[in-house]
Regions:
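N-terminal juxtadomain amphipathic helix
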Residues: 3-89, 243
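A conserved beta-strand element that flanks and buttresses the S-adenosyl-L-methionine
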Residues: 169
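Extended interfacial segments that mediate partner engagement and assembly in macromolecular machines
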Residues: 49-145, 150, 155, 211-212, ...
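Phosphate-bearing ligand-interacting subdomains
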Residues: 160-163, 174-178, 351-393
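A short glycine-rich, Lys/Arg-flanked "PGG" loop and its adjoining helix->strand segment in the class I
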Residues: 181-196
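Conserved acidic E/D residue at the C-terminus of a beta-strand in Rossmann-like folds
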Residues: 137, 338-340
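Short, glycine-/aromatic-enriched active-site segment of Class I SAM-dependent methyltransferases
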Residues: 197-221, 225-227
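Flexible, glycine-/basic-rich loop-and-beta segments that form/coincide
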Residues: 248-291
């Protein structure tokens, strides 16, 4: 990502005229969410800063989907408010994922590097299983938390020069980079000869489930199995296996190794399945764009109706995906609950809705709760029921 950052230092964004997976120039726009501020630019009243074009383009060569522009990464990631350890769901998943990797690799004392390690929660899980833990993260506030935990962490954007590792994990970060080819080339250089990289990308079923709200400026790419295979080969790696895990709306875990490694049947099977679902046709994506517009219009009508009847409408989870929905149609909720203390007391970008802690739900009046962070729906429902026991929701 270093070169991409240098390219954008003198301007706030770069137009993406080529597919970042295959390099082709045949891009077709299918989703327009207008101009929006950065989804994580929560503020204290001073404003959310500039707005940028938001939408999705389809590469008709490899069926990769991506944003039309790349915002300067330093504006989004130097100080980051998304903290992995805030969610019990994520903490449990990190434990599962560490065990999953350990069982596959048959290693208990190997070296593992987590790219975009956040507050070190995933590294915590690996260390409990005996791994030597290394990390890289560009956010100084989060890097310091991981460092205090005792992990060997560097404050930087990937790729950087790094000793070779037995395993490299990258959860929800490869899709955030304006140059994923450079990202994977850095992974290749830092893998031992028999090393394995686990590249996780979220919302593997976003198009089948109309999950357009996962579109925001941090998420530059939305990989399919086919586009990840194409990108890996360009980087000199091979996609050897694919798993789908029940986190973030179901996520792909792409398993990459050096060339010559055996390829599991899951790769061809997943690509074939995507094709039968329509993901290798242009009309599939055009319909997705139309459905997205219909959803935001219906949500605004519902919120407006409830508020007109005197019922407060409260969002739960000041997640980036929620900001996309609200800003797409200027939807004004009464307030938003979030369990991340770093966000409490701030206002949402664009819509300027106050963010409060969950105790704000403890009122006698009937309320409607909109689970903006719907990928944690069960956890949200449990929290709401606990606070509002016996009250109408």
């Amino acid at each position: 990502m270093q070169n991409a950052i240098k390219d954008t230092e003198q301007k706030s964004y770069t137009t993406l005229n080529n597919c970042v997976a295959c390099g082709g120039s045949n891009l077709e726009k299918f989703l327009d969410l207008a101009e929006q501020p950065l989804a994580n630019n929560y503020h204290d009243g001073s404003g959310a800063g500039d707005s940028f074009q938001l939408g999705l383009n389809l590469c008709t060569d490899c069926y990769h989907t991506q944003l039309p522009v790349s915002v300067n990464p330093t504006a989004m990631f130097d100080h980051y408010l998304y903290v992995t350890g805030t969610s019990q769901t994520l903490r449990d998943y990190c434990d599962w994922f560490a065990q999953f990797v350990t069982d596959r690799e048959q290693l208990t004392h190997g070296n593992i590097l987590d790219i975009a390690c956040n507050d070190g929660t995933q590294l915590d899980s690996f260390r409990k299983l005996g791994w030597k833990t290394f990390g890289v993260d560009p956010a100084k506030n989060l890097f310091e938390i991981a460092l205090e935990k005792g992990h060997m962490v560097r404050n930087a954007y990937w790729p950087i020069s790094y000793p070779q590792m037995d395993v490299i994990t990258a959860q929800n970060v490869c899709a955030h980079t304006p140059n994923p080819l450079e990202f994977l080339e850095g992974v290749k250089a830092s893998l031992t000869a028999k090393g394995t990289a686990y590249i996780q990308t979220s919302q593997s079923q976003m198009y089948q489930r109309n999950e357009f709200d996962t579109t925001y400026h941090e998420h530059i790419s939305f990989f399919s199995a086919n586009s990840m295979k194409t990108l890996a080969e360009r980087a000199g790696l091979v996609l050897t296996d694919i798993h789908i895990t029940p986190i973030h709306g179901d996520s792909y875990v792409f398993v990459l190794k050096h060339q010559g490694a055996d390829v599991q049947s899951s790769v061809t099977e997943t690509i074939r399945k995507e094709g039968t679902e329509g993901r290798h046709t242009e009309n599939f994506y055009r319909m997705f764009g139309l459905n997205a517009r219909s959803i935001v219009e219906k949500l605004k009508d519902l919120v407006t109706k409830c508020q007109a009847e005197g019922t407060p409408v409260v969002g739960y989870g000041a997640a980036a995906k929620g900001m996309t929905v609200l800003n797409a149609n200027d939807i004004q909720l009464d307030w938003i609950v979030d369990d991340n203390e770093l966000k409490q007391g701030l206002l949402t970008p664009g819509t300027n809705i106050p963010i409060k802690d969950r105790s704000s739900l403890d009122i006698d009046k009937h309320i409607v709760v909109v689970p903006l962070a719907w990928n944690f729906f069960d956890e949200i429902r449990s929290n709401v029921e606990e606070v509002r026991e016996g009250k109408s929701t």
